[in-house]
Amino acid sequence: MGLARAQGYGENLQKQDYILDKAAKIEIYAQIESMKGLKNCKEIFSQNINGYFIGPYDLSASLNNPGVFDTDEFNEAEAKILSAAKQENIKCGYHLVEPEISQIQLLQAKGYDMIAFSVDIRMLDIGARLPFVK
């Protein structure tokens, strides 16, 4: 708990109000990135959480095919996770690591509510190489 304006610079009453207000608004999201997460996704989603994110690289590695997302096994895993989430009426998220705008609509069509778009190092890498691409 820092000494910031949001917490009243450490003033006890404001700090308590801040904690209670924020605690009521906290949402919980699971990351499904392994065979264990895949196997237990129904149970995980029934635990009063708000949603989940698939980490595709870790999940594909757990399926013994790191970085490959177009296999039947990966697609079946993804469909199982999406279906379990929809049954529990929780938000579905996907971490789209490669910064490809065209993939956003495809993920939305699959039923994802939230898409974490790329990571800074991939965007910097691609942006830095762009002037040299012919």
Across the structure, where does each feature detected by a protein language model lie?
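Alpha-helix-loop-beta-strand connector modules within alpha/beta enzyme cores
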Residues: 1, 16-24, 70-93
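Conserved anion-binding
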Residues: 1-48, 56-58
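Hydrophobic faces of well-ordered beta-strands that scaffold small-molecule active sites
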Residues: 28-32, 52-54, 92-95, 113-117
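Catalytic cores of alpha/beta
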Residues: 36-47, 97-113
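Alpha-helical scaffolding segments of alpha/beta enzyme cores, especially the outer helices
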Residues: 43, 76-83, 102, 106, ...
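Glycine-rich, proline-tolerant flexible connector loops at the mouths of alpha/beta enzymes
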Residues: 54-72
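Short, acidic/turn-prone active-site loops that include or flank metal/cofactor-
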Residues: 57-58, 118-123
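C-terminal helical cap(s) of enzyme catalytic domains, especially alpha/beta-barrels
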Residues: 66, 108, 121-134
